[in-house]
Amino acid sequence: MRRGILADADRLGALEQRTTTTPFDAIFDALQRRCALILETSPITETQWRAIWERGRWSSASLAARATQGRIMDLAICHHIDPNGAYRDRAVEELKNLCSWSTWVDPCHNKMSADICTAEAALAAVVGIDWLWDDIEPSKRDDMIAAVADKALAPYLQAIEEEVWWHGCYHHWNVVVNAGMALAAMAMADEDPRAEKAEQLARAGMKHFFDAFGADGAWDEGTGYWGLTVRYLLLLAEADKNLRDDMSIYHSRGLDQTGLFPIYFTPNGRAASFSDMQTEPLHGAIYLLANQFRLKEVAWWLDEYSLGWDATTNGWSAAGLAMLFRPDNLEVPRTPKLDTVKTFPSIGWAAMADQWPHPGLYAAAKTGDMAVNHARSNMNAVQLQVDGEMMIVEFPRGRQSREFATKAQSRFYEVTARAHNTICTAQRDHQIDAQGSVIESESGKNHRWIACDSGGACGDGVQFIRHVVMAVDGESQKGQAVIVLDELTNGAPEKFEQTWHTRGKVELDADGKTATIAGIRRTVHVALGATVKTSVKVKSARIDSHCSERLLHVTGGAVGRVLLASVFAAEPIEQSVQIVESEQGATVTAGDIRVEFARSRTHLKLSSVEF
């Protein structure tokens, strides 16, 4: 088997020199704590994940393969840095257990010959064999290599012959399976004649991903799936560099920019994403972006947030691969250069902050293509964070939430757009063929502004444009309030609904126009206004067994043109929201905040913010 896939023995041994310098000393401490915790838990076995599957846990084998991969990598790296027989022996045991599984296909994908679990296990096996080569008996090593051939290469080729769907899609399944299998096949090239064909097919399948990956490096499946996708892509890129001196993946479109995408949607280290995997992708392999492209912002982000979690025994390698891949000659600033308004045109997402690196006030908005993978009826949706706490939230809507839904809740969410911070009309969901876009963006001394066009998502003849304006103190650059102004134009008399979702406790005032949202640490004051009569109610719903949401549900009737203003502020808003529209434009007043818009041919344009 080819050696030195991600690093050779000399490189692993040289990592010991890093442990006395910052930040590697902290990374190594986290790695040792994780490895010590792994020793206190039982090894991962097929019996375990099958029992979990029988209790109804989805992806039990895939998660077990992922955890095994992380354990093998971290234990092996820690052993190479500071030789420890217990770490070495446990890594070998985890590897032996993995290779003894009867299948590397998750039971939830039992109609496939190969799946994500196959790739996770195959990569874990070949890297583990490589890094533990001298610690495994030759006969056992041969058995492990045979397991990769029988449980990964052969099933993968069978899946391609069966024209499996993931080979031709563009999203994370494509990259995880094809990149993981390309890496494993490349390592197995001297062991099995099928490896060359498997690698060729895997790389051919990845062309669909590269064709869809935009120059701005954004990913329409959100931060969690971005991490899953880019992690496997980078591991393959590093293997190509080490085994073939091939840098073609690193030179592909968008990869030099993609490291910035998750930073803008994880303010203060908390995900503000728009998908059903809203996680912070703080994976050790992501340091390869900082290493290859000298992205100081990526190194800062990972240094700042990846060590802030308690050690666990599950998941991928974080600290181990951070020790291996973090550049040691990159001067990382305490205040990275990040834009206070950032748009990603390829997917129609945008983010704004009063200041970086630790925003006091932050908002994110999402438009884009409603036909993408994991799309939701959340065109023009918004999220809001105040002092690190998410106050207006996009909740993940997965299988678990449906299981816990009451009948009344199910009826309410039959219009799934109601589950998001957006607007729907006539009880219609957002149209699957809609393509929205960010049409305006601006950062000024005392404001931030983006405007989003829903692209017909609310139905034929309905135009929905959402403005998100942040009022910022010109001297301190501290955010004061976020004003959301919705332009809704409809050629027919129809009911509209606007929803704002939160984890906090909502208290609606008697006038029905002002409210407070009390979070764990912060309270947000809300004021609502419209150019037509509206009704505002507070609803609550159960997301799953341990999480509930509250929402402000605004309803009204519209024919022609309607403006709705929603103001979110850290301080109480002294007066109700006033909206005045004229031939010249529109003015929104909330307390001492005054926002002026000028009229253009297609939509309003921000002209001034005063407070």
What are these regions (language model features)?
Residues 305-311, 402-611:
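CBM-like, beta-strand-rich accessory domains located in the C-terminal region of large
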Residues 4, 20, 24-28, 59-268:
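Aromatic-lined, polymer-binding surfaces characteristic
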